C-alpha cells in the first residue's frame, strides 16, 4: 500500500514529528535541548545553499543545542529511492569542519565477509585505504534504514577527501562514542594515511 513515492513521502511527514518527540524526550532527560534540521542533497550543491546549511548548525552548536539532522524525505523523492543518512552525515561533517564522524549501525563495523551471512566473518578494525576493502563488501541494507555498507563506504570516501576520521560502531552499545575512541568496543576506524 505504501510502496509508491507519494505514499512514502506522506509517511515521512507523519513520522518526522513523532521521531523528533522521541529525540526531544530522550535528550531532555539528560538536560539537553535538540533542534530539527531537515536537509536535501540540493542543500550541498551551491556555495550559497551550503552557507545556509552550515550557519544554523554552527549557531545551534555554539548555543549547546544538538542538531538532529535528517534527510527531508517529505520533499525529496530522489532521496527516498536512493538516499541514506550515511552520505548525508559525511556531507554535513565536511561543511561544518568536523574532526570525527560516527556512523551508528546494527553491526560492529566492516567485516571481511557479511557477518549476517557468514559466522566466520572477521572485523576489520582499521581502514586507511578504501580500495583495499571494496572487495570485502557484500551488500545488505541496514535493518533500520536504506543505507547498507556501500553507502557507509561512500561516506568514508567523503571523509577521506576532507580529512575527517570516521567510525562505524554498533549503535546498540552503551556509550559507543567514548568506548570506540578508547578502543573498548569492537568497531571500524577509518583514517586516511
Predicted features along the sequence, with ranges:
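C-terminal catalytic "cap/lid" subdomain
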Residues: 1-193
